[in-house]
Amino acid sequence: MKKIILAAGGTGGHFFPAVALGEELVKRGYEVHFITDLRCQKYINQNLGLIFHILDLKRSSNIFLFLPNLSIAILKAIKLLYNIRSSAIIGFGSYPVISSMFAAVFLRVPIIIHEQNSYLGKVNKFFASFAKRIAISYEEVKNLPEFAKSKIVVTGGIVRENIRELDSIVYSASHRGLITGSKKIKKRLDSVVTPQNDKLFTIFIFGGSQGATLFSELIPASIQILMQKQPNLKLNIIQQAALDDQVKIKDIYSKLNINYECAEFFDNMALQYKEADVVISRAGASTIEELTYIGLPAIFIPLPSAADNHQYYNAKLLEDKKAGWCLEQSDISAGKLADKILDLISNPKILEEASKNLLKRRKEGHVLLSDLIEGVIYHPVA
């Protein structure tokens, strides 16, 4: 049985796409080893059929501390990769994979890079010269070295299986309506919507660990303004929020007499995606690929501190394709967000167009990348 190594950081944005790829490779008969860091421990499910290895690399801005840590991590990675003896390693970028990628270079293990964002990250750019192939999610990726362009293969992003199963739900702006005054607002076709939510326009808000605090202040304020402008709106709000913020948020929504669900973490995002008419979120690659796959439109507020400002480029690319909306954090206000939400509710055809444009980008990334890996293994390239 041939062995394949996946190297990915321990945050959900890197971890879940790598797991989805691993599951596909296991189905194809490979023994899959997953090298990651300590942050992923809350996600690890031993029933996935993957063999996990924790190889932590402590980040430090002090070069005199980082280099010794990196050297130790590389030696550990060399020992690990030597024992595994894999046919290929797939790197998903981010600093935790550096040691594994250096080890692969040293041991001459064929390297494939997967770039999820529309901007090639520093780690992936560094190892691009050693890679056999570079798989990308977007047709247009910034920061690509000229020499790397011949290695590029567009595979699309990789989406978790439970999200891919939502493919049967059709987004339609002309099926069900909700009434706001005398205006009829169209709603998406959703076979799982419950009778009590039949006429509610549902907004799903999540920001991850780096977005929840901002959203806990911005979103309720926006909804208050929205309800002042349109008191008859029938809304359903699903919002991720830190425990410390939930009392305040629930109090605001209760006083507005709107339906809401507020939680610190959603274990199964598919359930929330099923209910949503529009999403408000950060613009991480994993989030964008999931929304793209199911054609669910979103208002993106990119995280300004994201490496290389990649979230802005992700969101702006979709906005340019009329497949989403990008509102920069430095320029946003509760009033501007309320106006954008009201515009979308009042013009459902805009939502439907965005959904169609998202679906035009969809690819079966887990299949295409697995095919690419097999091509490198069985038909080696220079």
From Swiss-Prot:
Annotated catalysed reactions: di-trans,octa-cis-undecaprenyl diphospho-N-acetyl-alpha-D-muramoyl-L-alanyl-D-glutamyl-meso-2,6-diaminopimeloyl-D-alanyl-D-alanine + UDP-N-acetyl-alpha-D-glucosamine = di-trans,octa-cis-undecaprenyl diphospho-[N-acetyl-alpha-D-glucosaminyl-(1->4)]-N-acetyl-alpha-D-muramoyl-L-alanyl-D-glutamyl-meso-2,6-diaminopimeloyl-D-alanyl-D-alanine + UDP + H(+)
GO cellular component, one term: plasma membrane
Domain of life where this protein originates: Bacteria
Family: Belongs to the glycosyltransferase 28 family. MurG subfamily.
Assigned keywords, A-Z: Cell cycle, Cell division, Cell inner membrane, Cell membrane, Cell shape, Cell wall biogenesis/degradation, Glycosyltransferase, Membrane, Peptidoglycan synthesis, Transferase
NCBIfam families: murG
GO molecular function terms attached to this record: UDP-N-acetyl-D-glucosamine:N-acetylmuramoyl-L-alanyl-D-glutamyl-meso-2,6-diaminopimelyl-D-alanyl-D-alanine-diphosphoundecaprenol 4-beta-N-acetylglucosaminlytransferase activity; undecaprenyldiphospho-muramoylpentapeptide beta-N-acetylglucosaminyltransferase activity
Main function: Cell wall formation. Catalyzes the transfer of a GlcNAc subunit on undecaprenyl-pyrophosphoryl-MurNAc-pentapeptide (lipid intermediate I) to form undecaprenyl-pyrophosphoryl-MurNAc-(pentapeptide)GlcNAc (lipid intermediate II).
Main location: membrane
EC number(s) on file: 2.4.1.227
Protein name, per record: UDP-N-acetylglucosamine--N-acetylmuramyl-(pentapeptide) pyrophosphoryl-undecaprenol N-acetylglucosamine transferase
Organism: Rickettsia akari (strain Hartford)
Keyword Cell membrane: yes
Pfam families noted in UniProt: Glyco_tran_28_C, Glyco_transf_28
The gene coding this protein: murG
Record carries keyword Cell wall biogenesis/degradation: yes
Record CDD domains: GT28_MurG
A single BP term in Gene Ontology: cell division
Bilayer disposition of the protein: Peripheral membrane protein
Protein's pathway: Cell wall biogenesis; peptidoglycan biosynthesis
Record localization: Cell inner membrane
EC class: transferase
PANTHER family found in the cross-reference section: GLYCOSYLTRANSFERASE, UDP-N-ACETYLGLUCOSAMINE--N-ACETYLMURAMYL-(PENTAPEPTIDE) PYROPHOSPHORYL-UNDECAPRENOL N-ACETYLGLUCOSAMINE TRANSFERASE 1
Binding site for UDP-N-acetyl-alpha-D-glucosamine: T11, G12, G13, N117, R160, S209, Q311
